[in-house]
Every structure is written in C-alpha cells, then in structure tokens.
Amino acid sequence: MADNRRSRVITQGVARTPNRAMLRAVGFRDEDFEKPIIGVGNAHSTITPCNVGIGAMARRAEEALREVGAMPMKFGTITVSDGITMGTEGMKYSLVSREVIADSIETVGGGQRMDGMLATGGCDKNMPGAMMALARLDIPGIFVYGGTIKPGHYKGEDLTVVSAFEAVGQYNAGNLSEADLKGVEENACPGAGACGGMFTANTMSSAFEAMGMSLMGSSTVSAEDDEARDVAAEASRVLMDAVHHDRRPSSILTREAFENAFAVVMALGGSTNAVLHLLAIANTAEVPFDLDDVERIRRKVPVLCDLKPSGRFVTSQFHEVGGTPQVMRILLEQGLLHGHCQTITGQTIEALIGHLPPEPPADQEIIMPFDRPLYPEGHLAILRGNLAEEGAVAKVSGIQQRRISGPARVFDSEEECLEAILADGVQAGDVVIVRYEGPKGGPGMREMLAPTSAIIGKGLGDAVGLITDGRFSGGTYGMVVGHVAPEAYDGGTIALIAEGDTVTIDADQNLLQVEVDDAELERRRSQWQVPRPRYRRGVLGKYARLAASASRGAVTDADLFPEQE
C-alpha cells in the first residue's frame, strides 16, 4: 500500500479539489499530493527553558522529512512550566496540561488524517501527553526529546533548579546568606533544556527510550548541543521508514515494553511521576498494568545510578558515560530487560544495545556495576494500608531511615503546609499530611517541591515524613509518600486524619497506616462531607469532574461510558 494510506482521503480525487486548493496555499505542489503527510507536533515555547530550544529541532525535523520524501506539517502544542508555577495556584494546571497536550496532538493528527507523527517535548508533561496521543492515534509515531539543561555552577558546586528550591529553606534556617541565595538563583539554570537531574523530564525521556518509542541514546542529550538537532533529523528518517512499513505504536507499546520502562526508571533512580504517567500511557494503550506490577519490578531491579536529586551527578554527565543505553545493557545482561521487544526502528532492543559492554566504564562513578548497586532494590515503593487502600508511591532513595512513626501535622493545602514549615511549625519526628491536593480535590495533583525542599533546607529530610494525595516533583527526595488513593476529595482515609494521630510510614513493610481503630475511623467518616468543588468551570472544573484515581494514572478518559464496560 502507498505511504499516504491515511492522508489520501483528503488529497485524492475530484471531490477533494477544495482540500487541495487549501493545501497549495501552505506549500503543496502537484507532486506532493502523493507523499505521506507527517505531523510535527512542536512544543516550542519561551515560557520555560525546557522548551525554548525545541523550535530549532522541529525545523530540522521538517527539513529531514522533506529530504526523505514526506510532506511535514508543523503545528504547535502547549506547555506549562512546573518549575515556574511550583508552589502557586498555577501548579494546578500542570497535570491538566498533560491531558490537553494529548488531546491537541490527537486532534490535529486525527483531524488532518496524518500518516505519521513526530512529537517533540521538553517540560515534564510534554512527554506523557505526547505519548498518550501517539497511542490514541496509533499511526507510525516517534518522540523526540528537547534535551536536558547543563548544570549551573556557583562556588565550585554543580547546580540544578532544585538547588534554588532548597536554598530557600537554607536561607530561612539561617544557613545561607542573602548574597548566596541570589548567587544560586542567578546560576542554577544556565541555558536551554529540561531540569538537569534525573527529574521527571529526563526520567520520562529515558523510559520512552526503553520502550522503543525514541531513538537509542537520545534521552539524555543536552538541548544546546548539535547532537539534539541531529537526533531530530535521524528520528525523521526512522519515522519515514516506520510509515513505509506501517510500524505503529500498538506493536511497540506492549506489556513487556512497560516492564522495560519501569526497570530502567528504577535503575536510574527516577521520578515518582513516572509511575503516574506510565500508568496513564498504559491505560491509553489498553495495556493492563497496575501498581502491583510496579512493586514487583522494584523488588528485582536495583538503583544503579548516582544521579540528582538524591545523588551527586546531573544528566549531562550521565550521558557522557553511556547514558540510558549503558544502563539498559547492564539490565539486559542480568535478564531484567526484554531484549526481544520491537522498537520504532524495526529492530529489537537487544539488536540496538547488544554491542555495548555489559559492565559500566571503570573510570567513572555515575553508573554502578550490578553487583555493587547504590541500593539493592528500586526506590519507588508501593505502599498500602488503611491510609491508602488503593495504594501510594513512596520515594525511598537518599534517606537514612525507611520507617517513621509520629504525630500527624494536618494541612488542607500546600500553602498552609509551606507556611508552617518556614515558621518552624514542623519538628523532627512529625508526619506532615497535605490533603485535598489530589486529581479531583486540588484539582490537578500539585507537586510538593516547595514544602519538601523547605524541609530538606532546614535539615529535617531524614526526620520528617510527608504524605499527600498530590504529587512530588522529580526533584524531590526524603521520606515522602504521594499519590495516596483514594484521595481526600473521594473520602479516602487521608481525609479523616486528625491533628496528632500517629501515622506510620514503613517502606520495608510497604505500609502506610494511621494508628486509629476502625470504629473511630467510621465515626469520623459518618461526619465527613464532600467539599464544595474549588472550580466549577473551565479546564480545572472539567479535569476535576473527569479525573480517575492516581492509581489509574489520573487520566480523564478512563470511565467515560461505564454503563457499556
């Protein structure tokens, strides 16, 4: 069949004369109507350094697609900067933007009957939003990452944006001067690219590489290097081959591909958000995958990489010593990666990485050998108990104690919590509860980077636990538990906790428990009332109405027609 198997419905035949007339106005010539139309989903934006370099990548992709005989059609999609909106009401729009990105790319690709899709992204929600769209469209597609930022430098230290968040806590604790606070601010983000540790953006780009939907070695490139533009060109050539062979996401996004993704996320020490986003993509791709699968993989895969936020190194340094392909090769050698999985290139994972050495380079400290891991098990533990019947996600890397039991300090918003921390209202041994920040209650599951960074900055990272039905930034570390489900707005037990209740986090036992008997919890439940929605109109109102539980990825299309399930 011809490569324009979808677009021919708008380019061929007498009846499509008006369609062709409009296409001529955007550059089509007679010979172009037989070519496949490839969408270039362009996430370029001057809102955030994460996306400011993507325009050049999209232009290079356009050029390369023309060179291989395709007709590229570039269109824009949105981004919301997590780092800039962090700690404000604006952060409620962040997770919502994932759905908007998915909807927008799907809408253009479906509406214009495109034959293939090259999606770009930089900031955190760009990645899962784009991949959800590729899964929905199920046309040949590839994701191209905008690249990571390089580290900033101040007084001999490598900086990331998280350094600036932690500096706030250090300053408030009297451990950092105003001049040094300004110095960190001015040097933390030196140029273009996504936040530089193994935070959410770099975690998701690595996961997509492991799934076979991005080019091998592309997930850790630096945005300002020519290599990023070279990746865009090569991705265009690979995509054209996929169009020719009708190689679609449904043949790549298999259950085993998701297992590969989670194995790599664990080995990298990646973001908690990977759990939420990969579950959302699995839901979209109609692949059965849940929190129990995540925990099963965690117990088998050690943390191999010493990367920020809990480690020492940044992603650009990781790239220099082999990056994600090297980690995948180590996992493959240990039988922890499905090497037979197909990729968008038409080759298997094993074919693409089999030539790499099964051990990391000896002259570096970023990637550890399998027999000397940073941690013997994965760092993203799934906790359950009377506080999280559907589950919760704990990030247990970079902490000294894996169990904490203490009095609850209860806050019904992130703002209240941060104010108390900065005013020394949270002490060692406390367990902080931040609720009504879930998918529906927030709405939008805000990331609690400001409170957790303030806790770290005050030197309480190993002494205070924090539990929320919201999320955490990929830059968060410490004794933190997020994605608590059911959320407070749905009447989950987190809504029933009272100030001073004893709450236990036990990562070794996978336990999240409030030490209150069932009778008392039922008494409290009988008095609890569903809060009035914070938003009743607009995109936040729609999201609050449609969002599924965090245990299902907080997607908006999970239960649209329950009566027909």
From Swiss-Prot:
Catalytic activity: (2R)-2,3-dihydroxy-3-methylbutanoate = 3-methyl-2-oxobutanoate + H2O; (2R,3R)-2,3-dihydroxy-3-methylpentanoate = (S)-3-methyl-2-oxopentanoate + H2O
An individual GO BP term: isoleucine biosynthetic process
Binding site for Mg(2+): 82, 124-125, 447
Gene3D superfamilies referenced in this protein's UniProt entry, alphabetically: IlvD/EDD C-terminal domain-like
Positions bearing N6-carboxylysine: 125
E.C. code: 4.2.1.9
Key word Hydrolase present: no
Keywords from the UniProt entry: 2Fe-2S, Amino-acid biosynthesis, Branched-chain amino acid biosynthesis, Iron, Iron-sulfur, Lyase, Magnesium, Metal-binding
Single GO MF annotation: magnesium ion binding
Cofactor section: [2Fe-2S] cluster; Mg(2+)
Chain residues that bind [2Fe-2S] cluster: 50, 123, 195
Keyword Metal-binding listed: yes
Pfam families: ILV_EDD_C, ILVD_EDD_N
Pathways involved: Amino-acid biosynthesis; L-isoleucine biosynthesis; L-isoleucine from 2-oxobutanoate: step 3/4; Amino-acid biosynthesis; L-valine biosynthesis; L-valine from pyruvate: step 3/4
Top-level division of the source organism's lineage: Bacteria
PANTHER family per record: DIHYDROXY-ACID DEHYDRATASE DAD, DIHYDROXY-ACID DEHYDRATASE, MITOCHONDRIAL
Family listed: Belongs to the IlvD/Edd family.
HAMAP family: IlvD
Function noted in UniProt: Functions in the biosynthesis of branched-chain amino acids. Catalyzes the dehydration of (2R,3R)-2,3-dihydroxy-3-methylpentanoate (2,3-dihydroxy-3-methylvalerate) into 2-oxo-3-methylpentanoate (2-oxo-3-methylvalerate) and of (2R)-2,3-dihydroxy-3-methylbutanoate (2,3-dihydroxyisovalerate) into 2-oxo-3-methylbutanoate (2-oxoisovalerate), the penultimate precursor to L-isoleucine and L-valine, respectively.
Quaternary assembly: Homodimer.
The protein's name: Dihydroxy-acid dehydratase
Organism annotation: Halorhodospira halophila (strain DSM 244 / SL1) (Ectothiorhodospira halophila (strain DSM 244 / SL1))
